[in-house]
Amino acid sequence: MPIAIHQVLATLGYGDAIGHEALGIQRVLRTAGYDSEIFVETADPRLEKCTLDYRELPSASSRDSILIHHFSIGSHASRIAYALPDRMVLVYHNITPPEYFVDVHPLLVQLCYLGRRELGLYRERCDLALGDSEFNRQELEHLGFPETGVLPVVPDFSHLSGPPNYMHAGNFDDDAVNLLFVGRTIPNKRLEDVIRWFYAYKRWFNPRSRLLFVGAQSGFERYMALLNQLVSEIGATDVHFLGHVTNEELVAYYEIADVFLCASEHEGFCVPIVEAFHMGVPVIAFAATAVPATMNGGGVLITEKDPVHVAALIDQIVTDTSLRDRIACSQDSALERLAANDFGATLLGFVERVQRTPRRPHPPVAFDFWDQVKLADQLEEIRMYRPAAYQALPKDCAEGDELTEDAEGAHRR
């Protein structure tokens, strides 16, 4: 009889890369005959039916089981997973270096720093550590994890297969050139560089153009203020911050886009790049961290961020049909190479590898561990149902939960 292979993660989000991967892993495991549930702290209401509460995980735990742990910064679920007897496969989706948040989110600086330290504690706990890109695997190896591998991201584009919703995107569906960025509004994405590229393009090449930013903005209001200040200072017009959108709206924005721009300096994978490939939008991206591997020969990689140079490149792509066709072919080929990765066979191969490997000694857990878990649960209940009492608690009691909430989206998309 197959063993149980469950997953645990802090949040199952709708439409984000980690959520897609967790659901894909579950489909593969269940098809292979394994009992497989997803345990979470929180889930998007549309996905709650796919999950169980993380506090039920201990009752499903067994020495014979395997637990796939999607590492998250400072989550209650992570700490419970650490203490359970199951064999563990850790999946690392990357933690953004804290220096990116120094000027805009001091608390997140602390949390990302602590998160990288916490990750190191799992060296002795997990039987296998997987990155969802070679860049992430190399980080794990650098941290001293003895057994590592790559579980490649094979994006599920089903969320882009529905009919487009042009209710808002229709306002931009005209003869102007639309430059698009999709992703969270967060400093490592370097949206200020994208704004400078657009400003140079609009000023020197095409005044009939606009820049569209699509992606969640919550938690980084200070960074948003800096971006708006930059737009005002340089006199840029037609810059639109559109926030989080539905899948149907996202399809519409991809359909009206002429060029996709990515200036990010730190990515563990960057799913929007391959979404743009899939939607036939030419991509210009800065060659940093995992981005070159994600592009995999598709699109246009740049190694310098000079605005005039990038603006001239945008103009070439927009005006030269032959060049645009060659870029489209390169992106289609990159997608074919990505799709050739057999995600299911790779995952099941890692499961067999863990089963064949002698069990590692379980690291010691503090004698009061479960008392601390119970206390954390009580604090969470107070926060949810008696917020005034929660606010009256000493700062060091309540601060950890606030930090975790702000950080959960910091490395998505």
PLM features: residue spans?
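Conserved donor-binding/catalytic core segment of Leloir-type glycosyltransferases
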Residues: L130, G170-K189, I195-F198, L212
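Short alpha-helical donor nucleotide-sugar binding micro-motif in glycosyltransferases
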Residues: A252-A257
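Short hydrophobic beta-strand element within catalytic cores of glycosyltransferases
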Residues: I273, P282-A285
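Glycosyltransferase donor-sugar binding loop
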Residues: E41-D44, R208-A225
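Conserved acidic donor-binding segment of nucleotide-sugar-dependent glycosyltransferases
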Residues: V300-P307, Q316-T321
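Aromatic "clamp/platform" in nucleotide-sugar-dependent glycosyltransferases that forms part
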Residues: E265
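Donor nucleotide-sugar binding/catalytic pocket of nucleotide-sugar-dependent glycosyltransferases
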Residues: R123-Y166
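Nucleotide-activated donor-binding/catalytic signature segment of Leloir-type glycosyltransferases, i.e.
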Residues: M224-E248
